[in-house]
């Protein structure tokens, strides 16, 4: 042995390095997941604080049928609450107004028979 590592030693070093990399990546993924869960919990707390029960039910119904629109509404309500533009709680009528503002007009068409 003249100081050159054998194939077995090289293989062991590679395995150790791969395990270290996997541990580092796993740790970062858990941190991101925890941050996302915390952000979601904060968002839900803000919504619960600023929406009445009726408005919350309406929002949940919209989220079930149109998830993207529901997310937009949630983001809008959170932004309004954080900027201080919400006075009291948003009731069901105000939620209807928000929904009508943020949802695109549905295209309707008439069929005419001759």
UniProtKB/Swiss-Prot annotation:
Keywords: DNA-binding. Residues 32-45 have a biased composition (Low complexity). Signal peptide: none annotated. Residues 12-22 have a biased composition (Basic and acidic residues). InterPro entries: DNA_bind_arc, PDCD5-like, PDCD5-like_sf. GO terms for cellular component: cytosol. Belongs to the PDCD5 family. Residues 1-45 are annotated as: Disordered. GO terms for molecular function: DNA binding. Transmembrane segments: none annotated. Residues 1-11 have a biased composition (Acidic residues). It comes from the Archaea. This is DNA-binding protein rrnAC3180.
């Amino acid at each position: 042995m003249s100081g050159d590592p054998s194939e077995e030693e090289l293989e062991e070093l590679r395995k150790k390095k791969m395990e270290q990399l996997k541990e580092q990546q796993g740790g970062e993924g858990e941190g991101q997941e925890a941050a996302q869960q915390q952000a979601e919990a904060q968002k839900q707390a803000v919504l619960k604080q600023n929406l009445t029960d009726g408005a919350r039910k309406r929002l949940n119904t919209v989220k079930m049928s149109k998830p993207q629109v529901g997310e937009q509404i949630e983001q809008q309500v959170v932004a309004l609450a954080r900027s201080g533009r919400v006075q009291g709680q948003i009731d069901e009528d105000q939620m209807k107004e928000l929904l009508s503002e943020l949802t695109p007009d549905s295209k309707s068409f008439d069929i005419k028979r001759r």
